[in-house]
């Protein structure tokens, strides 16, 4: 599918990062004290004999390394985000010599968090919030050189890229709320001249969807009941009657993924009429809807498509760990080859227009992430720059295991256990002796724990603690029933799931019963407070980060 995921708004300033880091350090110090060990080095030596103590600053403030790898549409260049003089910037390198990278942007204060190649491969776009005033601006920087230029107003306007396609090289679609702060009107942007032309005035529509030829095909409007209506757009005219509607209970798990290049197929991620979100192909000529991808326990969470035809040829689910399913013989062979070459979860980040080069992210779970360039013709897989956190390369980190935990009423929780290095000498996924353990509760609660690497949990395992993070009821990604099972259950069945996870860890010889801490932020912080209020006998201590205290 042509790239039209857009550039999401986002900003994380250095002050905010430092504040979060200091908060985490204080919390970790509290954990060390409350479970009965005052000497972190002694605890690490006893329970993590396989690794030296890693400094807290290295784990929390070390270089983030390479992120958001992309290949240019023409396949000649590869790019990523990495620090330049301490600030995240865009780096580029020829695909023939990816080790010869150079920073193409040189932002000094405001980090770049999202970017994209232009469809003609001659420039890059990135989104930035200057000074934190929420006026998101789209900038363009030419590959050949020169300073960046602002393509959208720099004051009192929030802009975003709505659509771009390798089939249309001279323009992209952008949204801006300069006319009305509530709504984003849709514009066509000439990538060479920078000229903006109004295509559609929003007047209450929250978003627009275009096909690979950048013809606007759908407009989405919110309903008073929380659902969504999808209206057809033809030649710039919006049909007043919706052709599809999404009920409130399906809004989080149903969305338009895009159109095929011939315009005949509309792809959906769709949970309507079923528990889990499936991949649905809607034939717009006949009205027939086929389901090429579905999983009984997990939602379809991402897809990848041929850049020129727009046909989705693989999808991902994550019931416990990431699982990709190819829908064509070629894609199945590619995915199998990548699985043979790389250990861990993969992410297909970007594909060239000719589909001969891919950028693939690797998430080992117990190691920082990496980026790779995959040449499909030669089947060669080349690492693009080492681990995402370069400061940890060569260090021994904890072993992460994906486990399933059954709650008292039969609900299955997908969970992730990380053990200190050297604590599991026979490799059976259980420590040689029970350990002090920290139960990490994710926020939301409409979020989920994943197998991916987390610096804070690594800090704990390096210091001799086992860590356990679990997808209690109310967590997303496991179907509507798993989410709705948490309705009205704050402090009740959602809390029972956490207690059941602790009991499982104790029964498995993982955790010392009298040395279990609970830690979390947002909803996780609430769960900490509820745990200490309702079941204080289960926990030695708890660390609450900005959890709600009253409901």
Explain the meaning of each model-derived region.
Residues 73-74, 119-120, 166-168, 212-213, ...:
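Residue-level detector of Asp-centered blade-edge/turn motifs that repeat once per structural unit
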Residues 75-78, 124-125, 172, 217, ...:
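Hydrophobic beta-strand positions that form the internal "hydrophobic ladder"
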Residues 387-517, 521-522, 527:
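Cap/lid segment of the alpha/beta-hydrolase catalytic domain
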Residues 56-91, 356-359:
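Beta-strand-rich domains and repeat architectures in extracellular enzymes and scaffolds
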Residues 38-66, 92-113, 118, 142-159, ...:
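Multi-bladed beta-propeller domains
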Residues 63, 81-89, 106-112, 127-139, ...:
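A flexible loop/linker signature enriched in serine peptidases of the S9 family
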Residues 67-68, 113, 136, 152, ...:
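Non-catalytic accessory segments flanking enzyme active sites
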Residues 479-480, 528-551:
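Hydrolase active-site cap/lid region
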